[in-house]
Amino acid sequence: MAGSGGGIGAVLRDMGSSLGELLGGGKLGQAEEVSTGVLFGLLGALARADSIVTSHETGLVNGLLDELKLSTRGRELALTAFDRGRRNELNLADELDRLFTVHARGSEQAARLFDSLVRLAVADGRIRPREREFLNELTLRLGYDPGLLEDKLKRYGST
């Protein structure tokens, strides 16, 4: 997730549109609070996967917050979750278990979360080895075939 890319704005707009429904379009009920916490926690963990959380990665998260038009409460929840992930204070399996309490494994919402994490990981055009490890584990824990991750990485332009 490190580095910079010219198409970041387009990626954020697409993700904001895709994730808006998952996160309640800015209105946070219980399911949306869980989804927001899981998404941003995993974004923090993904950013941390290559050992350094860059200002670019933080900028991506802030851009995504703007695109999602979260309420003040939603932004606070998202940033707290991102910081937990960034500080390595969460467990991938536990976070996904939380997600599965409000969205079924294999649901459209889980697919959107997966797609968004992959897109942000490749936003700079490359995947570092620890980011790939994170994405591989995420893929398996979501119940997807590893080939799906490879297809998405090719589609989104990872090298």
Would you name each region that the model predicts?
Residues M1-A45, I52-T159:
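Small-residue-enriched hydrophobic alpha-helices in membranes
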